[in-house]
């Protein structure tokens, strides 16, 4: 992996290129549908990709600090063939991902964050997720309302774990500092 990072006042930039070669990837496999699934080291994978992130802080009108972060990542997986007919978990890594976050402070007590993620996995599944958080700070307490997956998107993350649909949280934090 090799990368470049630039930080100056209210602007930041990160760029990284990487290459990873892995062998003996574990998957549950079988040669016919009558056989039980067996965990086996079955594959080799060569992965290359890059990540790019930009961030900018600024002030807008009567609002306090505003922050915009934008990121893009691209991953290319080269899978070597397996000798098994059936695989329980097809390797399904991220292929392309765009992220954007906008954080704004209304005043010294109120702030909000809007987060956007658009992703494409190697099985060509594409999805978009939007999250929102608003927080109110009073003395040592912070009360937040969090809305996750506002679009109620059905999608899976790492290891094909299905992620929850739309959900909301109320969070109360106390700082002992």
PLM features per residue range, with description:
Residues 2-6, 52-56, 100-104, 132-136, ...:
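Residues on the lipid-exposed face of transmembrane beta-strands in outer-membrane beta-barrel proteins
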Residues 6-11, 61-65, 107-109, 136-141, ...:
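Strand-connecting loop/turn motifs
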């Amino acid at each position: 992996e090799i990368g470049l990072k630039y930080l100056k006042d209210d602007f930041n930039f990160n760029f990284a290129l990487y290459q990873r070669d892995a062998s003996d990837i574990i998957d549950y496999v079988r040669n016919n549908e009558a056989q039980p699934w067996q965990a086996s080291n079955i594959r080799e994978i060569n992965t290359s990709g890059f990540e790019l992130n930009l961030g900018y802080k600024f002030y807008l009108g009567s609002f306090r600090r505003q922050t915009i972060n934008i990121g893009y990542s691209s991953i290319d997986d080269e899978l070597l063939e397996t000798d098994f007919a059936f695989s329980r978990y097809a390797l399904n890594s991220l292929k392309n991902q765009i992220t954007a976050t906008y954080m704004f402070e209304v005043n010294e007590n109120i702030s909000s964050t809007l987060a956007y993620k658009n992703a494409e996995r190697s099985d060509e599944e594409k999805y978009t997720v939007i999250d929102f958080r608003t927080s109110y700070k009073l003395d040592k307490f912070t009360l937040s309302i969090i809305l996750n997956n506002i679009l109620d998107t059905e999608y899976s993350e790492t290891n094909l774990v299905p992620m929850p649909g739309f959900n909301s949280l109320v969070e109360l934090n106390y700082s002992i500092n």
